[in-house]
Amino acid sequence: MAQQRRGGRRRRKVDFIAANHIEYIDYKDTNLLDRFISERGKILPRRVTGTSAKNQRKLTIAIKRARIMGLLPFVSED
């Protein structure tokens, strides 16, 4: 017998930065940047977070700056 697929509408991800009207992504705002980093310390992709391409580029730059300044770890401490 063939298995049936369960359908269902997936909820569209919302760009957190655009929804909260954040104009400038500051590298010193580690609380915001932590939302977009995995527990292993990797930057989460757009398909997971739902950010737009423009905001994802800004996020990546801010996270890399924060890492260089020592505000965020490069890898997690397990």
UniProtKB/Swiss-Prot annotation:
Keyword Ligase annotated: no
One Gene Ontology term, aspect cellular component: cytosolic small ribosomal subunit
SUPFAM superfamilies: Ribosomal protein S18
UniProt KW keywords: Ribonucleoprotein, Ribosomal protein, RNA-binding, rRNA-binding
InterPro entries according to UniProt: Ribosomal_bS18 (IPR001648), Ribosomal_bS18_CS (IPR018275), Ribosomal_bS18_sf (IPR036870)
Gene3D superfamilies: Ribosomal protein S18 (4.10.640.10)
GO MF annotations, alphabetized: small ribosomal subunit rRNA binding; structural constituent of ribosome
Biological role: Binds as a heterodimer with protein bS6 to the central domain of the 16S rRNA, where it helps stabilize the platform of the 30S subunit.
Quaternary structure (record): Part of the 30S ribosomal subunit. Forms a tight heterodimer with protein bS6.
UniProt name for this protein: Small ribosomal subunit protein bS18
Organism name: Lacticaseibacillus paracasei (strain ATCC 334 / BCRC 17002 / CCUG 31169 / CIP 107868 / KCTC 3260 / NRRL B-441)
Source species taxonomy: Bacteria, Bacillati, Bacillota, Bacilli, Lactobacillales
